[in-house]
């Protein structure tokens, strides 16, 4: 039996609408949010996901300060936690500690129950927010997995299992890519360009997000303007603009403008625009505590906002990044995945992650302009997002960071 495991990770964020948010939360508390308060399993893992997100981001930022960054910490962590169910020894410890979990402070059962609740919440039907996540387990038809591993990934991570003919690599590649394309509504195609010949198992995670802003920009107001990629490079981008009430303030600690935009439903995007020359300071200074404080304490001001339309993507081979976070053994010949199968020693030969982010003017109602047109308060700020900035998208019910990124060039795919 071939002795390697090929692991593919996938994410999609399709953010099709952008607009100013509202300070007030939805007036009526839904049954879903009540259940989340009563069963806060995902809340226990949320701080660790946030720390993992920033650690992962900083590794990517150190690798290059001239390219866009976009990934889903939830997607990556879910796949790693699911894989950990079949690992033992140092391989097992490295994965969970790499995800910022302290096994002396949190029971492993609580970790997996947290992910179980997270996935249940993300996949709950919502008429206002399209948010779905899926885990696929593609198993060579000749490979016998241990019953406990198969039962756990299905019950805790809602994973689908597919019998796959990995001896025909092209057929297997197409099967996996079709699963991903369907799950991401056609936004990500051909995730796997090739498949190793000794692959016997593939773990695939995807997430699809499409949100509408509570109050959209007016498309007729969008104009071509300069975006300063760096001191020497300027590109022309469609720049949206709007006069209205925004959750916007300047944070002296981060030397950055902080803008929060609410989606219809239960998600918020935080955009961090550093002062000129302060991107490295922002990246080194921002913490999960600061971001949480922003979400809890929001001020509303009348402002003129200019924001670029964005269409970017990120594709990553995760080996190098995860190795920098201490997750190394699972990729080596010393990997212990004996909890997956007893038939042969396995190692992870491939770890892929892809994310796509689209932002434009669209919203649910054009009436937002009328409401904002009646605001008579004094204009306080004029802020132009015409240079690189960070973005973090949170899901409120689980208190988890769905996506993290840096927009260096809004037009660069």
From Swiss-Prot:
<feature type="glycosylation site" description="N-linked (GlcNAc...) asparagine">
    <location>
        <position position="165"/>
    </location>
</feature>
<dbReference type="InterPro" id="IPR023795">
    <property type="entry name" value="Serpin_CS"/>
</dbReference>
<feature type="modified residue" description="Pyrrolidone carboxylic acid">
    <location>
        <position position="25"/>
    </location>
</feature>
<feature type="signal peptide">
    <location>
        <begin position="1"/>
        <end position="24"/>
    </location>
</feature>
<comment type="similarity">
    <text>Belongs to the serpin family.</text>
</comment>
<dbReference type="InterPro" id="IPR042178">
    <property type="entry name" value="Serpin_sf_1"/>
</dbReference>
<keyword id="KW-0873">Pyrrolidone carboxylic acid</keyword>
<feature type="glycosylation site" description="N-linked (GlcNAc...) asparagine">
    <location>
        <position position="65"/>
    </location>
</feature>
<dbReference type="InterPro" id="IPR023796">
    <property type="entry name" value="Serpin_dom"/>
</dbReference>
<feature type="glycosylation site" description="N-linked (GlcNAc...) asparagine">
    <location>
        <position position="102"/>
    </location>
</feature>
<dbReference type="InterPro" id="IPR036186">
    <property type="entry name" value="Serpin_sf"/>
</dbReference>
<keyword id="KW-0722">Serine protease inhibitor</keyword>
<dbReference type="InterPro" id="IPR000215">
    <property type="entry name" value="Serpin_fam"/>
</dbReference>
<dbReference type="InterPro" id="IPR042185">
    <property type="entry name" value="Serpin_sf_2"/>
</dbReference>
<keyword id="KW-0646">Protease inhibitor</keyword>
<feature type="site" description="Reactive bond">
    <location>
        <begin position="377"/>
        <end position="378"/>
    </location>
</feature>
<dbReference type="GO" id="GO:0004867">
    <property type="term" value="F:serine-type endopeptidase inhibitor activity"/>
</dbReference>
<keyword id="KW-0732">Signal</keyword>
<dbReference type="GO" id="GO:0005615">
    <property type="term" value="C:extracellular space"/>
</dbReference>
<feature type="region of interest" description="RCL">
    <location>
        <begin position="368"/>
        <end position="387"/>
    </location>
</feature>
<protein>
    <recommendedName>
        <fullName>Alpha-1-antitrypsin-like protein CM55-SI</fullName>
    </recommendedName>
</protein>
<dbReference type="Pfam" id="PF00079">
    <property type="entry name" value="Serpin"/>
</dbReference>
<feature type="glycosylation site" description="N-linked (GlcNAc...) asparagine">
    <location>
        <position position="266"/>
    </location>
</feature>
<keyword id="KW-0325">Glycoprotein</keyword>
């Amino acid at each position: 039996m071939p002795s390697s495991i090929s692991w593919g990770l996938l994410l999609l964020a399709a953010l099709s609408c952008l607009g100013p948010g509202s300070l007030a939360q939805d007036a009526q508390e839904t049954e879903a949010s009540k259940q989340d308060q009563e069963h806060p399993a995902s809340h226990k893992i949320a701080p660790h996901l946030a720390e993992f997100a920033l650690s992962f981001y900083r590794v990517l930022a150190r690798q290059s300060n001239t390219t866009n960054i976009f990934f889903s910490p939830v997607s990556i962590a879910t796949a790693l936690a699911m894989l950990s169910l079949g690992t033992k020894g140092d391989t097992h410890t490295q994965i969970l500690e790499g995800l910022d979990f302290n096994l002396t402070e949190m029971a492993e059962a609580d970790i997996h129950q947290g992910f179980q609740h997270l996935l249940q919440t993300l996949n709950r039907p919502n008429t206002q927010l399209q948010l779905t996540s899926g885990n696929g387990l593609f198993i060579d038809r000749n490979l016998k997995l241990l019953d406990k591993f198969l039962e756990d990934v299905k019950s805790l991570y809602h994973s689908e299992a597919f019998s796959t003919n990995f001896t025909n690599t092209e057929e297997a590649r197409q099967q996996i890519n079709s699963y991903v394309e369907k799950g991401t509504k056609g936004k990500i195609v051909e995730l796997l360009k090739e498949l190793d010949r000794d692959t016997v198992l593939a773990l695939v995670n995807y997430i699809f997000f499409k949100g509408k802003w509570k109050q959209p920009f007016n498309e007729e107001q969008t104009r071509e303007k300069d975006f300063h990629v760096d001191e020497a490079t300027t590109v022309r981008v469609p720049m949206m603009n709007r006069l209205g009430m925004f959750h916007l303030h300047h944070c002296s600690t981060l030397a950055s403008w902080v803008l929060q935009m609410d989606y219809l439903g239960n998600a918020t995007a935080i955009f961090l625009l550093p002062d000129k020359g302060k991107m490295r300071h922002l990246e080194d200074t921002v913490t999960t505590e600061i971001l949480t404080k922003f979400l809890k304490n929001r001020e509303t001001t009348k402002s003129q906002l200019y924001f670029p339309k964005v269409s970017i993507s990120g594709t990553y081979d995760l080996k190098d990044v995860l190795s920098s976070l201490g997750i190394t053994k699972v990729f080596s010949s010393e990997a212990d995945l004996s909890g997956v199968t007893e038939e042969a020693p396995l190692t992870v030969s491939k770890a892929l992650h892809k994310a796509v982010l689209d932002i434009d003017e669209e919203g649910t109602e054009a009436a937002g302009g009328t409401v904002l047109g009646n605001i008579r308060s004094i204009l306080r700020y004029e802020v132009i997002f015409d240079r690189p900035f960070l973005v973090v998208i949170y899901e409120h019910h689980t208190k988890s960071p769905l996506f993290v990124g840096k927009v260096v060039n809004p037009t660069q795919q």
